[in-house]
Amino acid sequence: MEDFVRQCFNPMIVELAEKAMKEYGEDLKIETNKFAAICTHLEVCFMYSDFHFIDEQGESIVVELGDPNALLKHRFEIIEGRDRTIAWTVINSICNTTGAEKPKFLPDLYDYKKNRFIEIGVTRREVHIYYLEKANKIKSEKTHIHIFSFTGEEMATKADYTLDEESRARIKTRLFTIRQEMASRGLWDSFVSPREAKRQLKKDLKSQEQCASLPTKVSRQTSPALKILEPMWMDSNRTATLRASFLKCPKK
């Protein structure tokens, strides 16, 4: 799973996921499913923000090619992926500027158009079950919840999906692709089922023990070049390092 994650996600997303797990004292070598889940969640958050701006009239617009003459403001402030201290500083600044109620838990985004914090969820289970779990944890009507699944389903607070259909379809397509790529490598079942994941981990550890005493032959063959997909972020100093092209999983 770790190899899959490193091949299929943008290196900056992988780096952010590594930092997040380290911050909570989790070992990505063991918690490989969580590693994959964090990377997926980060990517969805960034895709949610992609191309969405507020024009001079205060209207929400979608711009994919960027007009250097347009005075545009990012519609969404990305909070997910930031250091916790910085994230809370950003939230405090937003609340002081907009008058928004400060959330008890770190949300993922802030929507400047609708003036609300957003909690993004990506689930391997039923969307309504995960939605209820999120709502029960947050316990705030001020934070908007939007849940996506790997099967193309989604659920949002008061059926308000925030984004246009095309933007949401882009996210759903990416999640479905991740699911297909995992399935083709025999990783999907363990990603969905914790019991299967534990069984697979024990199997891998046993296999490593059996191979430890065998002679090792070093391969000089280089890894296949990763193909670059269409960039999903526009030029901006705020998230420049994160707007590199997404990487396509190399086929085995």
Curated annotation (Swiss-Prot):
Its main location: host cell. Changing E2 to A/P: Lower shutoff activity than WT. GO terms for biological process: viral RNA genome replication; viral translational frameshifting. It comes from the Viruses. The active site is at E80, D108. Belongs to the influenza viruses PA-X family. The probable endonuclease active site in the N-terminus and the basic amino acid cluster in the C-terminus are important for the shutoff activity. The C-terminus acts as a nuclear localization signal. The C-terminus is recruited to host protein complexes involved in nuclear Pol II RNA processing. This is Protein PA-X. It comes from Influenza A virus (strain A/Wilson-Smith/1933 H1N1).
